[in-house]
UniProtKB/Swiss-Prot annotation:
Lineage, top ranks: Bacteria, Bacillati, Bacillota, Bacilli, Lactobacillales
Domain of life per record: Bacteria
GO biological process, one term: carbohydrate utilization
pH note: Optimum pH is 5.4. Displays 50% of the optimal activity between pH values 4.0 and 6.2. A pH above 7 leads to a complete inhibition of the enzyme.
A GO MF label: metal ion binding
Temperature dependence per UniProt: Optimum temperature is 35-45 degrees Celsius.
Gene that specifies this protein: levS
Biased composition (Polar residues): 66-180, 189-213, 754-821
Name of the featured protein: Levansucrase
């Protein structure tokens, strides 16, 4: 072959290679574009929210009215309304109205009523209205208004209100309302905190001043690092503040259990304020709520027939944790008593109904478990119950002793119930083996004597109650219970200096640290707060158990809260879910509690944790642990508390939540006894978040089945509606909290729980109706393009050029019996194309017909280019 022939041969070869590579790139672009389109079209899982009107600001007092004007320009609160669209990225809030735009950035608003003043500071809350859709990906709370769409990527809140306009720049506004009055006294206790914190100036990019450098030298290494991380100008610190910072214990030693931190407490309290439908207890139809017929029975103290309040209740469960089908009956034990009885009337009764019977009126009362000669000195509080191997019922409960002027000396106790069961009902035959199990050990858990001899009984809260039995697969039994920490990690002022108790970044921790130091009352509460969720192991004697071993707490709430009650554990799959009811009022942030009471009218919540094993370590659900939050004021008929979760048969990712409704002693009006509430479903998501579902039952339903759902029990937040969550006269009624007497519920806003037909985000990719895109390339009916070149029936000549024995003579390309002569020049390109196609196999969303078309075009172009090269070679040879 001459030199010129070689040049022409190479030119033809390079042309063919370039053609094939170009075709491959074109096909790849087409596939990638399609895959990106599918990826970007993922369902974000955010549910629509049904809102009427009501605006809410995350401050001490909120009162809103239609046509009210509020606005600001650097603002941490936000309101959005009809047809408004928010598309911010990392936004703390946005306020908009009907076709109105808000550009405000830091507003310290105060909303006042006739003759009342409210000073809300640092609003982070948000409220929204009808039919809003939120598309936030990482969002702490987001609710929007009529047909409003929010597309924020990291959004802390959004709030909406009809006809509200926002447009001022750094404005301390006041809005008058003729219908509601609200006064907050907390400002006297917290204003100095804000003033002190305001002295902590932020650093800038300038050279540190001499004062800054001098103060940094006064701080120890860890304290200086925390101040710098918080971007605080050390020059603004006083000598007293420097001295306090140097006392902080920054140790990162491993904790023995999980912690509910000060940051978690804030998250729980703010979740109540935001009324996020992900956590908020559903609204119930107040007119459908009935007193429990079975609560009319012989009272344990008086021995006479009486109507009783019903409070904490729990089912008899089988060893797996499901509600027991006990010889055809479902059994429930409940605390009950005559309302407004001096010194209390709190005892436990056995209730029963046919298993699976959802009719609230069919429940019957087998009577007081410990007879009708009880007194108010020795009372029984809540616990749990399990079926023993011999068919008896093992009851675990709280024995409360108030003799000798004791202030609720609580002890964990047990007893064995022998029942007579027939077609006519259930009767208590005998109660055996009653005895005290545990009184605290002083080391892991506080004893009553430690509490009684403490420095401040008035503000301290002693807890050793609510034992919940858990049976492991090997038959071992454990009790999980509410307690306070013992000397192992005891309550003290030192806990305020324990950095691990704060739970936030250095900026949050330092701010909270000085907040507690500068507020005498909060500091006192923080030094006393030592709530705990404890655990102990029982021996193998089911009917007469003793304590075998006591362990460190599963969860402690040092410095943050003094009470986490109604503990219970639900095993779902291979995970253990630990739940507890709590009140923000038992925490050490009174300003946060005041905010909850003012805006919602209640401060109750249910918290939850998850672990791979019973002994932990537990991780909080939803980051802060919040699972449920109060929805209505505490004195409404539909106010709920004492939440208890049970597993749902056939649904390993759901729990049924039970509670009681209407606070005792006729809090919601004369004749409205505390009663069992409708139950509802909470979804447990794979990412350790939870979602309240729009599924409610009749009152007192403990077993979810196909007949359980009753949408008539669901209500709305609308005064005068047929299914209103409030009875006539309840709107605006003040709640009398023994130490706090104020108007409440001024920031209530409608919310709507998620409908199961609108799956939460994790459910989307595994929904059979929405197949994941990788299924396309492996579908036999849609062969991928690489099938053509590797088809045995295709007599492609590439085998010849790669054979070492094959010469590179041009004889073969001109043989008419081998029309695929371009084999030699496309050898390298063909190999590249084949490898590239193979790499595309896992691409998502590939359009098969598009791929085949592009492949065919690429082959034609390659053949054409090769033919040109061949013709060039032939022509040159002929010449």
């Amino acid at each position: 072959m001459t030199k010129e022939h070689k040049k022409m041969y190479k030119a033809g070869k390079y042309w063919a290679v370039a053609t094939l590579v170009s075709a491959s790139i074109l096909m790849e672009v087409g596939v990638t574009t399609h895959a990106d389109a599918v990826e970007n079209n993922k369902y974000d899982g955010t549910a629509n929210v049904n809102i009427d009107c009501q605006a809410n600001v995350d401050g001490k007092i909120i009162s809103t009215d239609d046509n009210a004007t509020s606005g600001s320009t650097k603002q941490e609160s936000s309101i959005a309304n009809d047809n408004a669209t928010s598309g911010s990225t990392k936004q703390e809030s946005s306020i908009a109205n009907d076709n109105a735009t808000s550009g405000s950035t830091k507003q310290e608003s105060s909303i006042a009523n006739d003759n009342a003043t409210s000073g809300s500071t640092k609003q982070e809350s948000s409220v929204a209205n009808d039919n809003a859709t939120s598309g936030s990906t990482k969002q702490e709370s987001s609710v929007a208004n009529d047909n409003a769409t929010s597309g924020s990527t990291k959004q802390e809140s959004s709030v909406a209100n009809d006809n509200a306009t926002s447009g001022s720049t750094k404005q301390e506004s006041s809005v008058a309302n003729d219908t509601k009055t609200a006064v907050v006294d907390e400002s006297k206790n917290t204003s100095n905190t804000e003033n002190d914190n305001s002295q902590l100036k932020q650093t800038n990019n300038e050279q540190p001043s001499a004062a800054t450098q001098a103060n940094l030298k006064k701080l120890n290494h860890e304290a200086a690092k925390a101040v710098q991380n918080a971007k605080i100008d050390a020059g603004s610190l006083t000598d007293e503040q420097i001295n306090e910072l140097n006392k902080i214990n920054f140790s990162k030693s491993a904790e023995k259990g999980a912690k509910l931190t000060f940051k978690d407490l804030e998250g729980i309290g703010n979740a109540i304020v935001k009324q996020d439908p992900q956590y908020a207890v559903p609204y119930f139809n107040a007119k459908e709520i009935k007193n429990m017929p079975a609560s009319y029975t012989v009272d344990a103290q008086t021995g006479k027939m009486a109507h009783l309040d019903v409070w904490d209740s729990w089912p008899v469960q089988d060893p797996t944790g499901y509600v027991s089908n006990y010889k055809g009956y479902q059994l429930v034990i409940a605390m009950m008593g005559i309302p407004n009885t001096p010194n209390g009337d709190n005892h436990i009764y056995l209730l029963y109904n046919k298993y699976g019977d959802n009719d609230f009126s069919h429940w019957r009362n087998a009577g007081s478990i410990f007879g009708t000669n009880e007194n108010n000195v020795y009372q029984e509080w809540s616990g749990s119950a399990i079926v023993n191997d011999n068919g008896t019922i093992q009851l675990f409960y709280t024995s409360n002793d108030t003799s000798d002027y004791k202030l609720n000396d609580q002890r964990l106790a047990t007893a064995t119930l022998n029942l007579d069961v027939d077609d006519n009902g259930v009767a208590i035959k005998s109660v055996d083996n009653y005895h005290i199990l545990f009184e605290g050990d002083g080391f892991h858990y506080q004893t009553y004597d430690q509490f009684a001899n403490g420095k401040d009984r008035k503000n301290d809260d002693y807890c050793l109650r609510d034992p919940h039995v858990v049976q492991s697969e090997n038959g071992d039994r454990y009790l999980v219970f509410e307690a306070n920490t013992g000397m192992e990690d005891y309550q003290s002022d030192d806990q305020i200096y324990n950095w691990a108790n704060y739970g936030g970044d250095d900026a949050f921790n330092i701010k909270s640290f000085f907040k507690l130091l500068n507020n005498k009352n909060d500091r006192e509460l923080a030094s006393l707060a030592n709530g705990a969720i404890g655990i102990l192991k029982l021996n193998n004697d089911q009917t007469n158990p003793k304590v075998e071993e006591v362990y460190s707490p599963l969860v402690s709430t040092l410095m943050a809260s003094d009470e986490v009650e109604r503990v219970n554990v639900v095993k779902l799959g291979d995970k253990y879910y630990l739940f507890s009811a709590t009140r923000v009022s038992r925490g050490s942030d009174r300003e946060l509690n005041a905010k909850d009471i003012t805006i919602v009218g209640d401060n109750v919540a249910m918290i939850g944790y998850v672990s791979d094993n019973l002994m932990g370590k537990y991780k909080p659900l939803n980051n802060s642990g919040v699972v449920l939050t109060a929805s209505v004021p505490a004195n409404w008929r539909t106010a709920t508390y004492s939440y208890y979760a049970v597993p749902v048969e056939g649904h390993p990712d759901q729990v049924l939540i039970t509670s009681y409704m209407s606070n005792k002693d006729f809090a919601s009006g004369e004749g409205n006894y505390a009663t069992l509430a409708p139950s509802f479903i909470v979804q447990i998501n794979p990412d350790d978040t939870t979602t309240v579902l729009a599924r409610a039952t009749n009152q007192g339903d403990w077993v979810w089945d196909d007949s359980s759902r009753n949408d008539n029990m669901l209500g709305v937040l609308k005064e005068g509606a047929v299914n209103s969550a409030a009875l006539p006269g309840e709107w605006g009624k003040p709640v009398d909290w023994s130490l706090i007497n104020r108007s409440s519920g001024l920031g209530l806003k409608p919310h709507q729980p998620v409908n199961p037909s609108q799956p939460t985000t994790p459910a989307t990719p595994v929904n059979p109706s929405q197949p994941t895109t990788p299924a396309t390339p492996v579908n036999p009916s849609q062969p991928t393009t690489p099938a053509t070149p590797v088809n045995p029936s295709a007599t492609t000549t590439p085998a010849t050029p790669v054979n070492p024995s094959a010469t590179t003579t041009p004889a073969k390309p001109v043989n008419p019996s081998q029309p695929t002569t371009p084999a030699k020049p496309v050898q390298a390109g063909q190999a590249t194309a084949t490898n590239f196609v193979d790499q595309r196999l896992p691409q998502t969303g590939e359009n098969n017909s598009q791929s085949q078309t592009m492949s065919f075009i690429g082959i034609l172009l390659a053949m054409f280019g090769s033919l040109l090269g061949f013709l060039g070679i032939k022509k040159r040879r002929n010449d």
